[in-house]
Each structure stands twice: as C-alpha cells, then as structure tokens.
A protein has these predicted regions:
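Conserved adenylation A10 loop of the ANL superfamily
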Residues: 29-38, 235, 385-387
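Short, basic phosphate-binding NTP loop
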Residues: 1-30, 37-44, 48-49, 63, ...
C-alpha cells in the first residue's frame, strides 16, 4: 500500500517535471542485455555537446526509475514516511528549478508482463533504444515472445527508436508499430555498424563506425569483446540523431570505458588475464562472453561460470546449452558455482570432454582457482554469473594482481558488502 502511494507520487512528479521542462529530452534504454553499458556509453558521447543526466546505478524499477529521472538519490530508510517526505520536497524543487540538463538517459527494466506499460503511463520518450530480446526472467515471462512484446513496447512508445539488429530476431519486427525505427549492429545491413580493423588489449578496438548522417567515423574504443561494441554503436547512433558532429562523437568515444562487472579486463595473479563479467548473467550474454574468451590468445583459458537466475522452466535447457558450448580444446577448466550449473551445465561440459569442478558457493571456489592459476601462469579466466546468491566479483577480488583494482569491481558499496557478508555467513552455517 505504502509502496503504491510512493510510486504514484513519483510518477506524478515526473509528469510535472516534463511539463515544466518541455525542452528536456528523454531517452529510454530497454532490452534483455547490455542496458547499463548502453546507457553509460550514450551519456559519455552526448556529454561532449549536451548537459546529460544519467544514473549509473541500476535504477530501473517502478520506484528507482522516477528517482533517477529527477536526479534524486534513493533514501537509506525506504520504509520511512519522513524519508520519502524529504524526497517529495526535493522533487518539487526539481520541478521549479530552471533547466539544468538537456537530455536525460534512463534505463527501463522489466521483470514481468506489464512493467513497460507502467512506464508508458507517465513517460513520453523522445527516443528509445532496445538492446536485445533474449531469455530473461523466464519464471515470469514464460516465453521469448512475451519478452519481445514487453521490451519492444519501449520502441513503440517513443518518438523514434534504435533496435539492436544482432540480438533481436527479425520475426519480432511485426510487433513494431513505430514507423521511425533504425537498426544498429556489428555488421551491415544494420544502418549503424562497426568495421573492425585492429584489436589490442590496451587500446581496444580500432575501426570505422558506419553511420547514416556522417558516413564513416574512424575511432578507437577501449572495450573487450565484439558484443561490447554494441553499446558504443548505439551511443554513436544516438549522437548522430541528436545532431552531433563527427569531432564531437570522436571526442566522446575516447571516454567510453567498460562499466564495472561488464567485460572489464584486469590483471590477475600469475600474470593471468581476468575477464570480469560478474554483474549479471543470461544465456545470450554468457554465450557471447564464452566466444570472446575463446578468441583470447593465452597459454590456457578457464571459465568460471555461476548460475543464471530466474530462468524458470527454461533453466535446465539454457544451462545445458552453455555446457555444450564449453570446448575442451579451448578450455583447461570449467569451474561452476551454484546448484543449477552443477546440475545441468557441468554434465554437458563433461560429456564434451572438459575438465570440470563444481562448487556450492563462490568463496569455496577461491582456493582451487588460486591453485590453478599458480600452475597455469598467464591464463585467461572468465568470471560470469548472476548477482543474487552468486557474487563472483568476490572471487575476482582474491585473484587481482593489485588491490588498487578493487575499485573497478561491481557491488562494493557498504550496503552491498554487508549483504554479501550475511549471505556467505548463512552459507557457511548451512555447511557446518
């Protein structure tokens, strides 16, 4: 009851904000994968010309999204009436204050059918980006078609839309009613694409962005994995559509970096290459991360894979598919964390001939992984799993060459660290 009251008040304040600030543009980022990286890349490029508001935290729900749009931090005591009264006061101040931003870039997250319709009640998007339609929250959605209907609704509720051609099946195009839709992807025939000319671990990808408005734009982007280029492609496309020059886009491009826990390359023990993709996991994202690991030139490669949560009835099949992707000619070890990977992924990987070791929780895996890295100097090791109950970033922390790199890991706030301490304490108690 109280949550519903807060939500309705926040939605009304957002409506009032855009009435009071008609020149402020709202860009929404939806999709099954890569929303945060796409949002961050868009903000980096647009900042070269415009005043941009973007909350890097995962503020994408019915309560947190309005807060991010208004530029207000979530209160520490979310059940306190007085804390929310203070939030409402700040919201009124935002409405009354002259424009301090030109563009707001907002992530729109959906967990179930109807979530996007809730956003549509009070948001009028000038532009929408849909990053992909892949299995997510299948316990709630049931089918991929339901996921598509939900995510593509963002495109239909916007003035114009950009669709990731690589990660959205062409069969779902019939769901689009918006006539002003463009596509982006790693390859042509997407209207916005990228031609890779070179890759370097330090510098990233060098090549040419192919655009409608500005032709080819040469550039270098410090990201890892060709699928990590897609958020930058979306950002370049948005920059073009927002009237930026080639020089402005190139300048913004130089600032783009991987977001914490999203294909971030770090130095590890024994000269190892740590590929930190621990923020979350889904079948499409994990598949792309594995393919990227296979492309790394290293004496050996190791995959540390945690459960993919909220897969519902699809969990067995999706985990098994990933297990079948595990190639013994490419991987010296497949190390799993969690019950679903042990039950479904590990047997499939073993059947293919992979060396597999399973662990109930992340911290239990640490001594074994350290031992492997001591024996396999210079290995490339991928870490990827869902956040709830997996927390593979805590394993990465123990593998870092320098403790200074802890700042680059995901979920390191005091609140998150307390949550993880309590979780691992419960796991330890259950084992005793």
């Amino acid at each position: 009851m109280f949550k519903s009251y807060v939500q309705k008040r926040l939605e009304e304040y957002v409506r009032q904000y855009f009435v009071a600030h008609p020149n402020v543009k709202l860009i929404g980022v939806a999709g099954s994968v890569g929303k945060t990286s796409t949002k961050a890349a868009i903000a980096e490029i647009l900042t070269e010309k415009y005043r941009v508001r973007m909350e890097l935290k995962n503020y994408n729900t019915e309560i947190s999204a309005p807060m991010a749009i208004l530029g207000i931090d979530m209160p520490e005591k979310v059940r306190s009436f007085w804390a929310w009264r203070k939030v409402f006061k700040i919201a009124k101040q935002r409405i009354a204050t002259p424009d301090d931003v030109d563009i707001i870039v907002q992530e729109l997250g959906v967990d179930k059918i109807g979530d996007m319709a809730s956003f549509a009640r009070y948001l009028k998007l000038d532009m929408a980006i849909v990053t992909g339609v892949t299995p997510e929250h299948m316990e709630q959605f049931g089918t991929l078609e339901n996921v598509a209907k939900e995510e593509l609704m963002a495109a239909n509720m916007a003035g114009s839309a950009l669709i990731n051609r690589d990660d959205i099946d062409a069969g779902f195009a019939q769901m689009l009613t918006n006539q002003n839709v463009s596509t982006y992807g790693n390859n042509e025939p997407a209207e916005y694409s990228f031609a890779v000319e070179d890759f370097d671990f330090e510098k990233g990808y060098t090549g040419r962005f192919r655009t409608v408005e500005l032709g080819d734009i040469p550039g270098t982007v410090r990201v890892f994995g060709e699928h990590s280029l897609r958020p930058v492609l979306a950002a370049v496309a948005v920059g073009c559509k927002m009237g930026m020059s080639r020089e402005e886009i190139q300048a913004g491009m130089k600032r783009v970096r991987p977001v914490a826990g999203r294909m971030n390359v770090l130095r590890g023990l024994g000269g190892s290459i740590l590929i930190d993709d621990t923020y979350n996991s889904s079948p499409a994202a994990l598949s792309m991360a594995l393919k990227t690991l296979y492309e790394v030139s290293a004496p050996s490669r190791i995959a540390v894979i945690g459960d993919m949560n909220e897969m519902g009835a699809e969990s067995a099949a999706e985990h098994e598919k990933i297990g079948k992707m595990c190639d013994p000619t490419m991987l010296s070890w497949v190390i799993t964390v969690g019950a679903e990977t042990e039950k479904y992924l590990a047997p499939a990987a073993q059947t293919r001939g992979c060396q597999v070791r399973c662990f109930k929780d992340a911290m239990s895996a640490v001594p074994f992984i350290i031992g492997v890295l001591e024996r396999e100097q210079g290995a490339a090791i991928l870490f990827k799993g869902s956040q709830g109950g997996i927390y593979l970033e805590e394993v990465v922390k123990d593998m870092l060459h320098s403790s200074e790199d802890v700042k680059d890991l995901v979920r390191q706030s005091l609140a998150w660290m307390q949550t993880k301490r309590e979780f691992f304490a419960r796991v330890q108690e259950s084992d005793e």
